[in-house]
Every structure is written in structure tokens, then in C-alpha cells.
Amino acid sequence: MKHYTLYVSIAMILFICLPVSAAPPLGLPPLPIPADNPQTPEKITLGDKLFHDKRFSTTGEVNCATCHKKDQAFTDNLAVSEGINQLTGTRNAPTVINAAYMATQFWDGREPSLEAQSAQPFVNPVEMGLKNHDPILKIVRADAEYVDLFKKAFGKTGDQITMKEVKQAIAAFERTVIAGDSPFDRYQYGGDKKAMSPAAIRGLEVFIGQGRCVSCHVIEQTQALFTNNRFHNIGVGFIKLADKEDEVIQAFLESKQKGATVDIEVLTNENTSELGRLAISGKLQDIAAFKTSTLRNIDKTGPYMHDGSLQTLEDVVTFYNNGGRLVETDPLSPYLDGGIRPLKLTDQQKADLVEFMKALTSPEFAKQ
């Protein structure tokens, strides 16, 4: 509740994609940009091309946009994503929208930046399948269009082009995928008290009150990222891990000692995937804890949770209302965060909460 205060602030209304020097959309803070990777039009253009190039997969059929489609709110609407040869991983594809505001990347926060994150899917066997990044560099150093774009963006050609520049360009493009100005933003920060429906307004009260959603999906005085950028065990996936936690942890640690990468382990092993943040921190307290995702555009980014196990927003509300389980008679995880407990919401409150979450949709995605 301490994060939520009713004040009014007017900000610039802006649509995707965000120009280099533009103010942030209504409801969002200034965009964090690394000092060593400033935004430029040339870099963004290059990053856009890299993001959509299917030659960077072993089959020539998969690119970043395969799992992050613009016309599907930069997700793929699958429970878990499909890579080369229709191989599936273990995780639901997070939206790229507003990923630039996240303190860490991936569900378990295993990479600290968009730059670091962008390199991993290329070399994951269930995503784009390359053995290493050499094929990417071979293409961009020889392709005439890439040669021109890299020279304009970085002043580099030939062997001067490395994965550092590739990652920086992709990250620069992803930092343009920004969206605010939702009905909630216009209601909360724009002073338009008719921007949300009566049901959504009631849902907002549930969100900040009895539902306690705001404890993790933060709303602040002048902006709302709808995430605290922290990791929590809310009970998702517990049944997969139940009674074999020690065995799975031991197997994972042994694999790491043999040189296995976390990125590959968590996407190719269903049990390892459920370790969550523990796979990164090594702390038992982080078992099955996953990053708090933003709720912006949530109506367009289902299925939900790290494993895509909840199909609808109604399922999500039911899951939380039951204290960390979709079915009230299912067992509860013994590792639940302390704040996860039954909410005792009425059917009307649950319906209103769903309507509020639908009011977090930015106009450019409203018709998707």
C-alpha cells in the first residue's frame, strides 16, 4: 500500500516505438539507457534487422520475433515457446514490451541487461540452435547491407564487428519497444476519470486493497511499472518439483560443475526449470522463485506464469485467491512467500480485478 498514492501528473502521450530523444509515455519513468550504449537511429535500425533475421538459426526459420511477435504484444501466445524444428523449452516467452525497465532479464533474472540477454537464444539448442556465435559474425561481416549498417552505427567493419556490437544493437532496438498511455494511465496520471470503466475502477480498489496485488506489482506516485523487480515463490509449478527437490538441486549442481550453462539447463530440463532463482543465486530460499512480471498489456500476453500454466486472467485471479493454487484442494508449496495466502475475494471482486487488468492495455495493442 505504501507504493500507492493518488496524485495526478501529466506526461507525454507516446506510442511504440519510442524515438531516440522522446519523453516516456504517460505512466512510465524515463527510460534507463546504459552509458556505454546510447540510443542512436542507426543502431536502432540495425537492431531491428538483427532481431528479425532468420539466418541466425540452424534451420533458417527462427528469429527473435518468432517468440516475440509485434502483432501478439511481443509474445507468441504459447504456454512455452517453440524454437527450431518445433522443439519446445520450459518457459513462457516474456513480452519485450517495457523489458527495458526490468532490472534483470529472463524469468530467473540470470542476465543483468538486454545486451547480455540478447546473446543467449542464438546458442540455445531449443531456440535458435547455433553451437556458437561465429555464424552470426560471418553473416554480418560479409552481408553488404549489414556492412553498411554496422559502419553507420558503430564505425566498424570486418573483424572489428564483434558480438558486443550485435548485442548492443539488438538491445537498442528493444529499448524502443515501450508502451504506456493505457486507460489506467489516463485515469491515474492524466486526470481523465472516465478513462476506466466503473468495474475497472472497482478492480483498482481491489488491486490496492484486499487483493494486495500492489505489494509486488507496484504503482507509484507518478509512474507504474507494475513490478518490484524481485523474485517470489507464489506456488506455480510446485507439483512438478514436489518430493524431489534435493535430487533436482544435486543434479543441477553436478551439471554446472561439468560446465553446463544455466541458460541451457533451465530451458531443456523441466525439473531444473522449476528451481527458479535458486539456479542463479544458489540460495535455498530462492527455490521456485520467479521474477515479478509487469502487468502492462497483460490481457494480450497470455498464457501466464513462467510455465504458461494459467490460461486466462480469470485463472490467475483464482490462483491467487486460493492462496497459490488453481484448484482449492491441490497441495500448497511449502516454500511459498509469506504474502501468498487466500484473499477471500467475492465473485464480483474477482471479475472487477480482471477488468482492471484489461485497463492496463496500451492503445497500440488494444485491437490485438
Language-model segments: which ranges?
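Post-cleavage N-terminal segment of exported redox proteins
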Residues: 2-46, 50, 102, 117-125, ...
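Short glycine/threonine-rich turn/loop motifs
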Residues: 23-120, 185-310, 315-318, 326-331, ...
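Short linear regulatory motifs and low-complexity interaction segments
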Residues: 335-337
